[in-house]
Amino acid sequence: MSKTQHEVNQNIDPLKMAESLELEQLNEKTLNDMRSGSEVLVEALLKENVDYLFGYPGGAVLPLYDTFYDGKIKHILARHEQGAVHAAEGYARVSGKTGVVVVTSGPGATNVMTGITDAHCDSLPLVVFTGQVATPGIGKDAFQEADILSMTSPITKQNYQVKRVEDIPKIVHEAFHVANSGRKGPVVIDFPKDMGVLATNVDLCDEINIPGYEVVTEPENKDIDTFISLLKEAKKLVVLAGAGINQSKSNQLLTQFVNKHQIPTVTTLLGLGAVPYEDTLFLGMGGMHGSYASNMALTECDLLINLGSRFDDRLASKPDAFAPNAKIVHVDIDPSEINKVIHVDLGIIADCKRFLECLNDKNVETIEHSDWVKHCQNNKQKHPFKLGEEDQVFCKPQQTIEYIGKITNGEAIVTTDVGQHQMWAAQFYPFKNHGQWVTSGGLGTMGFGIPSSIGAKLANPDKTVVCFVGDGGFQMTNQEMALLPEYGLDVKIVLINNGTLGMVKQWQDKFFNQRFSHSVFNGQPDFMKMAEAYGVKGFLIDKPEQLEEQLDAAFAYQGPALIEVRISPTEAVTPMVPSGKSNHEMEGL
């Protein structure tokens, strides 16, 4: 070593040298940890245990889709953004997990509005990523810009716009928490294009800190005591089970409760499956197209126990005359639902599961009320849902659904579109448990059926999935049938074809002097050829004598099938409580 080199080395401070080396290593680690916003987003989704993304690409989300190319999360390519969000709803309903949707900006984002609203009405957990123009272009009418935050504010639990790439983990973690806590619902994350390409070394997020956002799940002891006092005094008890029972997966607890105290049970449309169909205490669905036994029990009871239903107008179309002789208890996780429609004697803000757990742990003796139970059961036996008059020309939709119930042993996952077929499915399919029934309740969205069946099958691939759809709703989202052979999904689509918009026509027949204004299709496509074009096996049933044999063949077929069942254009859903009438004022019995 030369003298000059020796002198230089002697002058180096070992402490500074160590600090310099540590800084160099830190900088190297920082550079190695740098990821794009899109990569961070995928990491955040994986941390939330996301299995599927339902989406449709476009310019504003190309950085995201480039990251999806690695296939760390399975992406389901819908044929329309509305199909993507309805598929996510079906997935969420059956799996109990969060449905995740990714669409581009502008028209891609506006196309998911119906599905977001549908999920908001039916309390389904979704996280929807909408693409957005790059940050510098926001507010300047850039190509495919839309103010998604303003549009979705009334139809989401929360919405976000990513303004800093470092915020992505926190926003994603919060969004999943909000979507799944309390009353579940949709959350939107607006994702500007530049946020997908900017680099960051941010860590993933584990903490939740949302000021003012608190969820009450535990019932108060005083409310439990008050409820028990009411329970002990009642002689004509009825449980009304809504979607809150199925959402909280408290079906077994409810069955235990009603059997322990011998309480006749009514469900809402979205509460079907809350207690098994064959349970002797189950009276059926209540409301507009509910059973005679259910509506009479709601009218005659002296204690109505509402568990997770929001008293919507299809159940209680005349609120001031609803359950006129009853003291009403309403248990709901959403405080805003208490006293919103029906004034109640006792409102309990709690999770239905925790409420039932608290009750089932207590030893409560009720007044002897076997006469009331027999009365309700007699009503059920004397006034069942009608199959209707025998038809020598057309198939009967009621018989079709009833027979499919037998083929599937009441264990299939059933999705529906919206219309008459939806009500027939609700009336005649023998549901056994929660998670079997996937339908659009609060919003009543035509086009929901086929895409929701795709999400349902992905959520539970080992279960038989049946989709009931009318010829009107079928033509709104039938393009999603392409996904069935593409992803190997064995879904049986049962197309109830009456050549009309059946429910609209039924109302025109009853309330508009049979003026059938634009409710009859004067031309229809060949649905069997459509099935063939999409790679789906077609079965046409246009004669009543073919019904059972053809249904057996269709359900024995290994693969997706479209089963067209032709019914009379005059077939009606009965009974019916006309809008504005009390529940006991049923017509068509």
For the regions a protein language model found, what residue spans apply to each?
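Conformationally flexible catalytic loops at phosphate/diphosphate-handling active centers
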Residues: E24, E174, V178-E233, P384-L387, ...
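Thiamine diphosphate
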Residues: L62-T135, D141-Q144, A293, A297-L303, G308-D312, I338-V341, G347-I349, K353-E357, ...
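Active-site diphosphate/adenylate-binding microenvironment
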Residues: S38-V42, L46-K47, L64-D66, Q377-A456
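Glycine-rich phosphate/diphosphate-binding loops that line cofactor/substrate pockets in enzymes
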Residues: P14-A18, S38-V50, G90-G96, H120, ...
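Glycine-rich, anion-gripping cofactor-binding loops and their flanking helix/strand elements
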Residues: R93, A243-V329, K432-D462, T477-N478, ...
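Glycine-rich, acidic loop regions that bind phosphate or pyrophosphate groups
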Residues: K3-N9, T130-I171, G271-H375, L551
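Phosphate/pyrophosphate-binding active-site segments
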Residues: T4-L31, E166, N325-Q420, P544-E545, ...
